[in-house]
Amino acid sequence: MGHHHDGGDGVPQHHVNSPRFSGPMTRRAQSFKRGGSAGSSSNNNNTHVGVSGGDGNNNNNTSSTLRVHHEIDLPLNSPRSEIVSGSSGSDPSGGFDSALNRKHQTYGQLRERVVKGLLRKPMGSVVSDFSLRERKKLGHWMFFAFCGVCLFLGVFKICATGWLGSAIDGAASDQDLSIPRVNLLDHSSHDYIYKDGGNDVDPTLVMVASDVVGDQNSVVEFSGVWAKPESGNFSRCIDSSRSRKKLGANTNGYLLINANGGLNQMRFGICDMVAVAKIMKATLVLPSLDHSSYWADDSGFKDLFDWQHFIEELKDDIHIVEMLPSELAGIEPFVKTPISWSKVGYYKKEVLPLLKQHIVMYLTHTDSRLANNDLPDSVQKLRCRVNYRALKYSAPIEELGNVLVSRMRQDRGPYLALHLRYEKDMLAFTGCSHSLTAEEDEELRQMRYEVSHWKEKEINGTERRLQGGCPLTPRETSLLLRALEFPSSSRIYLVAGEAYGNGSMDPLNTDFPNIFSHSILATKEELSPFNNHQNMLAGLDYIVALQSEVFLYTYDGNMAKAVQGHRRFEDFKKTINPDKMNFVKLVDALDEGRISWKKFSSKVKKLHKDRNGAPYNRESGEFPKLEESFYANPLPGCICENTEEEGLMRRT
């Protein structure tokens, strides 16, 4: 590689590094002849080569300058020497002195010519010659400085990357955890995963709860719209006290129960009946399930739940048997319908004496037979132990449910579970027909009259909607998701049956095309054991909804209550509870052109800022039926707020 620089005389000198030479070889500068022909150059290009900093504007003056800078002293014995040519027969010493005099005269004449030439040049041109020379040198120095800075930054980046990479590798090797594309760092009871995945996923800190829902798939949490709310110092507190009395062998009688309603209504009823059995020190016979409800599902308790786990988990709380002892099989049970929203005193004073008298009692209803509030802590904690630990779904439901969760988590991404309760039975029951045709509205009214135990027959659907009593339509749901800035690429799991109304799902499908359900995610072979078993299918939906990053429900039914309460219990996972009354007013204002989309979105986000599943205390109401359900919010009762010291101990 060649390098060059300007010599002190302005002539570029080229240094060539060659393996043939131990040091750099300097090329000869261009030579110029002395004598009368010195006024012109053999090549016009010599102007810019020979002049140090010249601009070539005055060729004659430049040539003079070049002659000064490159005069060559010839040896005295050269054939061209003036001494030899001018003094052939004279005294050598005199000739030498004469030659010296002539040489001094020649140099004097040359200096005089140069000075005159410079004086004849305009002063600006002279200054320009020198300023251009300095400018050129400054440019070279700036270039070298720039190259040096770039080199320094490059070396620094390489060193820093190498150090950081070695530090990360060292941390990973210390943990001895290695799976493709994911680095795991264990910390206390949680695993922290750093995602370093594809182009569409930003590197995100993800927490995987190792103790969530038993053996179910890991639940990931992301930032932005997918992030869970702050849970503060709250934690689960349902473990039995160490000082409690051991369960004795004696019993006051046997309880037979028939859990009524759909899947989640039956769950609540079973939880209450376990607590009632505890209050009365009774033995519970394995529950039977309602087969006469709207869904007409003939699944039994053992089909829906892991019955052996149920008995084992509660063995220290109550006695549970599969069936009545043989000596009591012939006894006619005493039939009793407990009063709704009752407290402990009612069961001890009014029901327990009857149980002791008849030994075997059959309770006809189980739903809402215990109050939400004002119960002993031991009773509340037991209800939660039943709901969140003992009532584990049967193996077929658990296994397929977890498969559906893994299929929803494509590339470990988040998904939203949407409980879109826009089904025919719900619309008929509530009398809501907004956006439906007149024919569809009439069909719903006829269905309402056909179901005898539905008390309300004539309902003003418009008024009910404005009061927040209707499930959101698919279009309204789409507007809500868009206003909250969920991306159109969001993966959504539909926790519901078929939506009612011709084309009612079109707006939601258009805005969010990645919508799935158990019938889409599972094969026909996988779903064949669940055909005609709506409660088992509801169990699948429950598992997928529970493990989602975000759960959104459009109507506050039993499924919504059960899932949101369970998600609160599992460290307050994000659950969007729409303010339907105010939201539909905003939708109407948007449709009527009274507000812009920007204003609409801003108001929707403000409206739901604190409706995301964050902790707050359930409070007693004037009427038990109007209170918030204990199973929708088990705080207080099953979730406790720790002190700072307790929180620190829990984290360590």
From Swiss-Prot:
The chain crosses the membrane at residues 138-158. Signal peptide: none annotated. Pathway: Glycan metabolism. Residues 85-98 have a biased composition (Low complexity). It is found in: Membrane. GO terms for biological process: fucose metabolic process. It comes from the Eukaryota. Its main location: membrane. Substrate binds at residues 419-421. Its EC number is 2.4.1.-. It is a single-pass type II membrane protein. The keyword Glycoprotein applies. One of its GO terms (cellular component) is Golgi apparatus. Belongs to the glycosyltransferase GT106 family. This is O-fucosyltransferase 35. It comes from Arabidopsis thaliana. The lineage of its organism: Eukaryota, Viridiplantae, Streptophyta, Embryophyta, Tracheophyta.
